[in-house]
Amino acid sequence: MIGGRPFRAATLTATLAAFLTSSSSAQFQTVDLVDVDVVVTDDDGKPVTGLKKDDFDVREDGKPVELKTFVSLATSEDMSVPRSMVILLDDVTMPTETVSAVKALATYLALQARPIDDLSVIRFRNQDDEPFGDRRAALARIQQYQGAPLKYAPAGAPEDVLRLIASVSKKLESTGRRRKILVCIGAPRICAVREPGRFAGGWFYGDWTTAISIAARANLSMYSVLAAPARFSGDGIVEATGGLIFRNASDFRPLLDRIWQDAGHHYLLGYWPPSSSKDVHTISVKVPRKDVHVLSRRQRGN
């Protein structure tokens, strides 16, 4: 015969385990501290320094959150702290006549890296490219870059792009809390995937949530440099991860300089998120001052 006390203990343990694994307890799930890297610039695009924790208004899903950690980083001025950048070359949609332009843009970016910076180049169709390396290896991959094999070659599917972003983010997640930047040079279909609807056209919604989730944990933001004239509207992976899209410029060099500037000047804010079972959370960061512009990720996964 089973004794009363052991039986009650076993029953309580089983009941608690069932509760913790049930869908109804999703709102009580354990959450990690959320880190948000924030770039603040003035009207001239120059970094705004000297801000304090109380200068920031941060909200998740519309609710104010209390900042628990606050770090101001200016690694561009500290030669002992590396910046982190991965350049993604679109070799799927860019025709051969654009190869020289893509190479020139990528080369300019690579040459701005300091010896201490972490820089790598990956090509969309090359599965062997890893987001690690040095400037010499990066320049070699740029020289090896080739455009699409056919002028009207099928473009990479949105889910393929999102899976690549997730893979790069995952590999860089272990490199610390510092900001990482993924710069895609190419066409919108690869470099600026639009956000899917949850139901309408949302066959890659799961890939979207995975990509923004891992990118948020890795502090990775995506920037896009559209190397050919393109008509495009926002609300995509670039905006969701806190990056910028550059296009239709007669001189891209100041824009490329801006990317390195953002990699080296930013604020890192940390907060405990409100309990929620939503798949995707919206993030809003504001600095209630005149003549300042705030750039930060807009979404994170659960």
What positions do the PLM features span?
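Bacterial N-terminal signal peptides
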Residues: A10-S22
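Bacterial N-terminal signal peptides that target proteins for export
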Residues: M1-T13
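Scaffold/interface architecture of coatomer-like assemblies
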Residues: S24-N302
